[in-house]
Design a protein with these regions (language model features):
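Iron-sulfur cluster-binding electron-transfer modules in prokaryotic oxidoreductases
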Residues: 1-179
Length: 179
């Protein structure tokens, strides 16, 4: 049904917010002969900023850390666009505080492994371990580029008692609030 609609409306390009949809549309659909240009919203936003189509104000003074979504980063190799976006909204470029495990070595939030839908009975939950890494950066804000990662980071924030101390955002929110 999707393919029929793509053909009916002559769809050539799709922009996704969800990294899992990015993978499905870009890779899986290509395997069955569907030719589409598929990009993640971080690529679009970074391109709009680079080409001065949008100009967010650099108003964030707090330190911020970025969680690389597995399906944007390791599966598609996109690490620069989200960081370029963050640099565009930070007053000081040194306010971006990387977690020790970032980019190619980033640690999964757990959503892709199904941890969002069940309760771990023993050991530390993956999203809590990842959120503790965010806490250790000293940042007051955590940004990501995946709807599932946001859910996991929000849960990690609550479990670690950081509800009042830290905020979780999608990178698009940070830009939208500043244009």
């Amino acid at each position: 049904q999707n393919i029929e609609n793509f053909e009916k409306y002559n769809v050539k390009k799709i922009i996704t917010q969800c990294p899992h949809c990015l993978t499905t549309l870009k890779n899986d659909y290509a395997e069955i002969g569907v030719e589409l240009e598929v990009i993640h919203h971080s690529e679009l936003i970074a391109d709009l900023i680079k080409n001065e189509k949008i100009q967010p104000e650099a108003t964030i003074e707090d330190d911020i850390t970025f969680h690389d979504a597995c399906y944007v980063g390791r599966h598609h190799g996109e690490y620069d666009a989200p960081r370029q976006i963050l640099q565009s909204v930070l007053k000081d470029s040194s306010s971006l505080k990387e977690m020790p495990r970032n980019k190619e070595q980033s640690f999964c939030c757990g959503a892709g492994g199904g941890n969002m839908w069940y309760e771990i009975k023993q050991g530390k939950r993956i999203n809590v371990e990842r959120f503790e890494e965010a806490i250790d950066t000293g940042a007051k804000k955590v940004a990501t580029s995946c709807n599932f990662c946001m859910i996991m980071m929000e849960d990690g924030k609550k479990v670690t008692g950081q509800d009042k101390n830290m905020e979780v955002f999608d990178i698009a929110e940070l830009v939208a609030e500043r244009i």
